[in-house]
Amino acid sequence: MRVARFCTVVAILLYFGFHIAECDINFSLAGADGQTYNTFIAKLRQELSIGTQKVANITVLKHHVSSNTQRFLSINLFNYNGDKITLGIDVFDVYVVGFLTGTNSYIFKEAPDLAYNKSLLFPGSVRENLSYTGGYDDLERRGAGREDIPLGLLPLDTAITNLFRRDSTSFRRSFIVIIQMVSEAARFKIIEAKIAKNLYGENTFKPDQAIISLENNWGALSKQIQKAQDRGGVFPNLVTLTTSSGKPLIIRNDSDPLVQNGIALLKYMSERSVEYSITDDTVNESNGAFLEIMEIHDLM
């Protein structure tokens, strides 16, 4: 696995107002396994976390940048043959806004306005605007649902290959794989752990209702965790998730093990008054915590 070593320095310089070329984060399937995948996700979180703040000891993503050039991160994904695609990631929410293959770039419908600026994202490429968004509703509308699409090394290889070859008939399915294995894994440590556990050989797994429930409720969890800071950590509104066995799982406060050990990133929500703590430039992981969440809540 290849991860750009200079990205942290670049991000720090950008934070202090130096305008330099954006850095890339790389992940290659050649030699990839659970450990290299964890390193990749940790690096992505580290870049997203620089210059941010924390609530309930969880990183809250940025909601403004000092320069438009800092709005997107580039992530290079390589398949087993070494073919490369580049994802454009919005640092505000970890959404994939588009991708680049060769000299051709594609941007999702309803992406942030800055994503359509060719000088900011994939400069010099031949641009095509897709007719659908990167949301699951649109991606699943003409293809299989998340519960029917396997995740793993081989599905990721197929997804990268389809995008590299510009096979538009497979774009939606390919992005369902990529978004979960990149964006959702960055947001949720518990999803990262589930994926990493299954990254060996030809092994795959299909997301169950517990994982899909987490993905669908990231915004709600982000909002309640931040609003709870004025209420002693108690959520103003309960968040109801679903366990793997189909039982409702109610999250009431920010001390819940799932919140403290399962969530890595929060989307910034403005409807609150919160006291922040400044984050450092490192991201600590705990495999033991992952197992604790799985055991306590039966999510996996």
UniProtKB/Swiss-Prot annotation:
MF term (GO), any: rRNA N-glycosylase activity
Protein origin, superkingdom: Eukaryota
EC number(s) given by UniProt: 3.2.2.22
Keyword Hydrolase tagged: yes
Top enzyme class: hydrolase
Keyword 4Fe-4S: no
Similarity-based family: Belongs to the ribosome-inactivating protein family. Type 1 RIP subfamily.
Main function: Ribosome-inactivating protein of type 1, inhibits protein synthesis in animal cells.
Name recorded for this polypeptide: Ribosome-inactivating protein gynostemmin
